[in-house]
């Protein structure tokens, strides 16, 4: 989790698209949202959020192969605090692993 979320940023995630789609509803929380073929859009107050994704080439580290998804996050009409509040929940639901 970060302390600041820009209006637009990109990430890589180590998951498959079916895994991502399984986690997405809980990560979105109670905000009304719609899913497209490779995107999701949400209304947050008077602003909006959109995430677009595409499958990338798997990352290979020695004999291990890790799936990779490229994500682009875009907020419109939300201030720093609103973006942080939404992404705090989103990131907690998307977080995997221990440590």
Regions of interest found by a model, annotated:
Residues 46-65:
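A short, structured beta-strand/loop element
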Residues 24-26, 85-91:
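Short amphipathic alpha-helices in soluble, non-transmembrane regions
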Residues 7, 38, 47-49, 67-71:
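A generic structural signal for short beta-strands and their flanking turns/coil linkers
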Residues 1-27:
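Terminal, regulation- and interaction-focused segments at domain boundaries
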Residues 40, 44, 57-60, 73, ...:
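Amphipathic, hydrophobic secondary-structure cores in small proteins
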Residues 28-31, 91-98:
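A common structural junction motif
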Residues 11-15, 73-78:
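Short beta-strand-to-loop capping motifs
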Residues 17-22, 79-85:
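Short, conserved charged micro-motifs
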């Amino acid at each position: 989790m970060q302390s600041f979320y820009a209006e637009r940023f990109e990430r890589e995630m180590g998951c498959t698209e079916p895994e991502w789609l399984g986690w997405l509803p809980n990560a979105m929380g109670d905000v009304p949202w719609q899913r497209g073929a490779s995107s999701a859009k949400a209304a947050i107050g008077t602003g909006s959020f959109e995430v677009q994704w595409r499958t990338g080439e798997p990352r290979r580290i020695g004999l291990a192969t890790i799936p990779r998804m490229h994500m682009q996050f875009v907020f419109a009409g939300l201030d720093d605090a609103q973006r942080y509040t939404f992404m705090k929940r989103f990131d907690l639901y998307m977080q995997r692993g221990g440590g």
